[in-house]
Amino acid sequence: MVMLQSPAQKASDSASAQNTAVGGLMSPNSNPDSPKSNTSPDVASADSVVSGTGGGSTPPAAKIPKFIISANGAAVAGKQEQELRYSLERLKQMSSESGSLLSRLSPLQEDSQDKEKPNHNNNNSLTNHNANSNTRRSQSPPASVGSVSFSSPAQQRKLLELNAVRHLARPEPLQHPHAALLQQHPHLLQNPQFLAAAQQHMHHHQHQHHQHPAHPHSHQHPHPHPHPHPHPHPSAVFHLRAPSSSSTAPPSPATSPLSPPTSPAMHSDQQMSPPIAPPQNPPHSSQPPQQQQVAAPSDMDLERIKLVAAVAARTTQASSTSALASASNSVSNASISISNSSSGSPSGRDLSDYGFRIQLGGLAAAAAAAAATSRQIAAATYARSDTSEELNVDGNDEDSNDGSHSTPSVCPVDLTRSVNSSAAANPSSASTSASSDRDAATKRLAFSVENILDPNKFTGNKLPSGPFGHPRQWSYERDEEMQERLDDDQSEDMSAQDLNDMDQDDMCDDGSDIDDPSSETDSKKGGSRNGDGKSGGGGGGGSKPRRARTAFTYEQLVSLENKFKTTRYLSVCERLNLALSLSLTETQVKIWFQNRRTKWKKQNPGMDVNSPTIPPPGGGSFGPGAYASGLLYSHAVPYPPYGPYFHPLGAHHLSHSHS
């Protein structure tokens, strides 16, 4: 079919040749010069694709492959190959441009173009894998849209096979419906299942193209025929190509997604998706390109690639999916394309099986995961699983109306995509895929949240923070991070010295033996690390996830305990000296004192923490060391205000009062 011809012009040329060679197979709709055969890579391609898609709507146009291969095969093959390379490059550019071009176009246009593009690209890839890369210039059977309707699927298959072989020979041009997919997943070219599916898709898609004789016009022209594509549509596979097509087609604003369900974009999607049940595609033709709007051009591309795989899986379930797709027309453009594949082929022909295999071979897993809808795929891709699910669910509900694939709303989602292996469970698949997408999104979110909440990630503790899976993890972690920021220095230095035990003791030493370092150690180790993070944070220590404790040595604990007996608050100088003497960081010492004060407070509920257990050697609690410790280190104790840090020695009293 013209689709084989690489350029839109070639499409028209081949359309004319097809008119002669195919012997009037070309429908009157197909015009060599019709927009469908436009040479413009974007608009012409889109038009050609649309017209090609719509042009052959009447007959299967199975003759096209034969004719194209025979009549246009040699010249067109060369041209298409060139065009394919160009189109693939063009599609790549258009893929990048498609976002802008599609965005330029009305969202509906973008989507419809995207959808059409996938269809056109898919159609072209079906008819011409080489031409397909023509950015759908000749992808659509421009001339053959109306005039060329291949009655024999065999011819189309021949053409598809040639195209498939061509795209296999030249993975780059990949007029293949899966051109985009293949570009990203070149290994699919070596996948016999994928290739077979692609070929069948091409055959079906050729039928689709022929089934759109009314779409010689640009995509904008609504497909007057409801895409009664009796031909199986390999659309599922084409959706892979769809992203390229969408990037290619955007220039044809005529294909505004607003166009009625007959809009070529929708029809292209329908054609592409109905490769399994082309006869049911006509209902899809009613699907408005607006649904195509749903997916953004870029999303459409991503989704289409996934959709192609998903469509393959869906196509497996295409019979139910086609109804689902038509029902869920609004779901998403990408999902429309997929649903077109599935809804267009409600019968779930081998193409769907192929599509499924293709999914399995290439994007199968991803497509299966995103199987619910193209939007669901997008949801899976973009964590939009909820919306996609809803759309999919709707599509699934409609999908139950398998015959309702004609329903304008194209549930672009084949539930089977989420469940690749389940080719028949469309509604359940859609739901499953929706739920799977949702679960996946949830898992991702949970994972992200867990990462964010993971105290180990942000505490900077050398030691593992321990399991922070508690629901209170946030508050604890914040508290603990506060602690750990203080303790981390301890932990780091102490961990270097293997001070975990000491830190545990120290940190846990919230409340027992103040004076006895060993008992303190025991209490620390045994006691909850209440004072750990927040010297007054006792109580949360046991329940909240614990930061890895600084392991204080017994000597360190004894020294710290003795110092604590002397003064419960260390001055900056004292803390520094003590840290240096104990080979600890000031933060570790500070945190230890905070925890120790907390423990002491617990042990001595009514007593002033600031009152030194033992009068400082300098002369009682008011010794300069005591003052400094109280003043400067009162901050270490959460209870005393931080002001004492900066207070003069007199602040020692303040710090005591603070406590």
Swiss-Prot record:
Biased composition regions of type Pro residues, renumbered to the chain: 250-263, 275-286
Database matches in PANTHER family: HOMEOBOX PROTEIN NKX, HOMEOBOX PROTEIN SLOU
Family in the record: Belongs to the NK-1 homeobox family.
PROSITE patterns listed in its UniProt record: HOMEOBOX_1 (PS00027), HOMEOBOX_2 (PS50071)
Region span, 7 X 2 AA tandem repeats of H-P: 221-234
Major localization class: nucleus
Tissue: Mesodermal precursor cells of distinct muscles during embryogenesis, a subset of neuronal cells of the CNS and their precursors and also in cells of a small region of the midgut.
Protein's UniProt name: Homeobox protein slou
Cystine residue pairs: none
Organism of origin: Drosophila melanogaster (Fruit fly)
Sequence repeat placement: 221-222, 223-224, 225-226, 227-228, 229-230, 231-232, 233-234
SMART domains: HOX
Gene assigned in the entry: slou
Amino acid composition bias (Basic residues), ranges on this chain: 201-232
Keywords: Developmental protein, DNA-binding, Homeobox, Nucleus, Repeat
Compositional bias ranges of the Gly residues kind: 528-543
CDD domains for the chain: homeodomain (cd00086)
Subcellular location: Nucleus
GO CC annotation, single: nucleus
Regions of compositional bias (Low complexity) in chain numbering: 27-51, 95-108, 120-135, 287-298, 316-347, 417-435
A molecular function GO annotation: RNA polymerase II cis-regulatory region sequence-specific DNA binding
